[in-house]
Amino acid sequence: MRLTQGCFSFLPDLTDEQIEKQVNYAISKGWAMNVEWTDDPHPRNNYWELWGLPLFDIKDPASVMFELQEARKACAAGYIRMNAFDASYGTESCVMSFIVNRPANEPGFYLERAEGKGRQINYTIKSYSVQANPEGGRY
């Protein structure tokens, strides 16, 4: 099952050229870029691991692409995403986020159902990869 989080997630994987164009766009808007990775793809997992430091004053897309290539070398078997942060007054938030690397096999999720008080049914989404493997060995 293909993980769909962030911009472009329903499109085919972006090429490096397309990623660089998005980075160029973000830099032209004055947004700071950063690279994050995870091996826990749960839809509610918003706290991915930060790769290196945020690239605040970078004006050259090649520097961002270099960091992406380094992250791919170290975390090739997991998910890697790029974020653009708009620090302007009134926004101060992530304005663009997209996945740039995926594991070869994405096993997907399952729905766990549990009965609560008064026959209330509670649902939880769990990842097959997280249930089967410890952190750091999932992909």
UniProtKB/Swiss-Prot annotation:
Keyword Plastid: yes
A GO term from the CC aspect: chloroplast
Molecular function GO labels: ribulose-bisphosphate carboxylase activity
Subcellular location(s) per record: Plastid, Chloroplast
Gene3D superfamilies xrefs: Ribulose bisphosphate carboxylase, small subunit
Domain of life: Eukaryota
A Gene Ontology BP annotation from the UniProt entry: reductive pentose-phosphate cycle
Residues of the signal peptide: none
Keywords: Calvin cycle, Carbon dioxide fixation, Chloroplast, Photorespiration, Photosynthesis, Plastid
Keyword Chloroplast listed: yes
Family annotation (Pfam families): RuBisCO_small
Membrane-traversing stretches: none
InterPro entries for this protein: RuBisCO_ssu (IPR024681), RuBisCO_ssu_dom (IPR000894), RuBisCO_ssu_sf (IPR036385)
Coiled-coil region: none
Described purpose of this protein according to its UniProt entry: RuBisCO catalyzes two reactions: the carboxylation of D-ribulose 1,5-bisphosphate, the primary event in carbon dioxide fixation, as well as the oxidative fragmentation of the pentose substrate in the photorespiration process. Both reactions occur simultaneously and in competition at the same active site. Although the small subunit is not catalytic it is essential for maximal activity.
Subunit structure: Heterohexadecamer of 8 large and 8 small subunits.
More details: The basic functional RuBisCO is composed of a large chain homodimer in a 'head-to-tail' conformation. In form I RuBisCO this homodimer is arranged in a barrel-like tetramer with the small subunits forming a tetrameric 'cap' on each end of the 'barrel'.
Similarity comment: Belongs to the RuBisCO small chain family.
Record protein name field: Ribulose bisphosphate carboxylase small subunit
Organism of this sequence: Cylindrotheca sp. (strain N1) (Marine diatom)
Lineage: Eukaryota, Sar, Stramenopiles, Ochrophyta, Bacillariophyta
